[in-house]
Amino acid sequence: MRDAALRYPNILFDLDGTLTDPREGITRSVQFALARLGIDEPDLARLEHFIGPPLLQCFMQTYGFDEARAWEAVNHYRERFRVTGLYENRVFDGIPELLEALVGRGHTLYVATSKPGVFAREIARHFAFDRHFKAIYGSELDGTRTHKEELIRHLLDSEGLAAEHCLMIGDRMHDLLGASRNGVACIGVGYGFGSEDELRAHQPTHYCADLAALRQVLESH
């Protein structure tokens, strides 16, 4: 039963780096895509910046690809990711308990991810946390709604939610920017893939270095 006093009855979670650690699946799939294009990158750590931002833009910015070449890379990435990379992932310790507690308090939960929705829903199903969420919103395979600002606006409109009743939680600047540009409060979490400097520079409503701090902040909202 919803607590009428909840400050933010609706909570939007990013997926990669916030609910799960997708490091292996994403970096190995990027490595695979690059190899298909004749680029050898043996160091997976050098590919971790692909976790979070829109994939197409990340290929363009990192390797100087034009859009057509970047789409080639994205399609090669998906060849591996949809079969193997989806499952090279793990739910962060403490997340299932946090989601259970939030739902128990009456919050309605959503996923808002730049990852294609078809992949996000399969990850949530496979790792058995989909039951906690009213809906899982992601981008389309054609690149529509890969930007967080557009995605969050679409979620708010589709669900009929007032921005002031929503809270976005994410680990990268894109999450914070997307939220703030829609008038949504946001929490930056430091246990994912964005640095504290990156997150604080975008002035989140709260910064939580770890899951314990996140839980403490959420208990007050």
Swiss-Prot record:
Enzyme class: hydrolase
Active site: D14 (nucleophile)
Keyword rRNA-binding: no
MF term (GO), any: nucleotide binding
Source organism, top-level taxon: Bacteria
Record-linked InterPro entries: HAD-like_hydrolase_sf, HAD-like_sf, HAD_2, HAD_sf, PGP-like_dom2
Catalytic activity: a ribonucleoside 5'-phosphate + H2O = a ribonucleoside + phosphate
Protein name per the record: 5'-nucleotidase
The keyword Metal-binding is assigned to this record: yes
GO CC annotations, alphabetized: cytosol
Function: Specifically dephosphorylates nucleoside 5'-monophosphates to nucleosides and inorganic phosphate. Displays high activity toward 5'-UMP and 5'-IMP, significant activity against 5'-XMP and 5'-TMP, and low activity against 5'-CMP.
Top-level taxonomy: Bacteria, Pseudomonadati, Pseudomonadota, Gammaproteobacteria, Pseudomonadales
Needed cofactors: Mn(2+); Mg(2+)
Enzyme Commission designation: 3.1.3.5
pH dependence: Optimum pH is 7.4.
Organism per entry: Pseudomonas aeruginosa (strain ATCC 15692 / DSM 22644 / CIP 104116 / JCM 14847 / LMG 12228 / 1C / PRS 101 / PAO1)
Keywords: Hydrolase, Magnesium, Manganese, Metal-binding, Nucleotide-binding
Cofactor binding annotation: Divalent metal cation. Prefers Mn(2+) over Mg(2+).
Family annotation (PANTHER family): 5'-NUCLEOTIDASE, PHOSPHOGLYCOLATE PHOSPHATASE
Sequence similarity: Belongs to the HAD-like hydrolase superfamily.
